[in-house]
């Protein structure tokens, strides 16, 4: 589970937490002493912990929009955000109920209502996409505040619409969906953490070791995000994490080569010893 914080054109991974199913926690506790047993923490509890940590760091009076996909869209989490005077924009599953009616039924109920055509810039180099949306206002089940739901289709004949909730009723559907697009960097972070930085390489390790590994990987991606921020130039795309990683590797290699040349010049009769000290494990051709 990840919490990403966008700041203007920049974005930083604020925190990551490992979610373990209740069954997995019971399994792990069989091999642990009573005083070291793990407590099960639900998705809501993990999200709440991260949001409360972030809240303490936010400037007073900040306008906050919390964005998440349908996996996290519980009434408890939505209500937590509303109690903090934050707004929520999130995806919803089709079986959620608005005014006691499933939201997927509203597509038929509103068939007399014309679609609103909106255009959203793509989050990648592809052309802008057009969507056809309808909105319906009411109360989501177990959420006391009035909200509105966006029914979004790729075309008027699309039979698999997507559903989104917005608690800020002053926003248009286009404004709400444009804000929701800012959630995309979370997916980029997730992919990069697992495939490049090795976040998923924690199998068969103790829970304590996993937490330490998460902290190390979190620091690594924050370094790359900070590097991207330093390299930012207005009216130019923000450097990708891959570009920042390559630049770091090149800088590290250059520093190593300079040190290698310097040491060999000082001690020309100890070439192999110097190579082994600076490049351990690499065989030297003779």
Model-identified regions with their sequence ranges:
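Basic, amphipathic alpha-helical segments enriched in Lys/Arg and hydrophobic/aromatic residues
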Residues: 202-257
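Long, low-complexity C-terminal extensions of enzymes
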Residues: 237-286
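A conserved active-site cap/scaffold subdomain adjacent to cofactor or substrate pockets
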Residues: 159-166, 179
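Short, conserved catalytic/metal-binding motifs centered on acidic residues
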Residues: 3, 65-73, 88, 164, ...
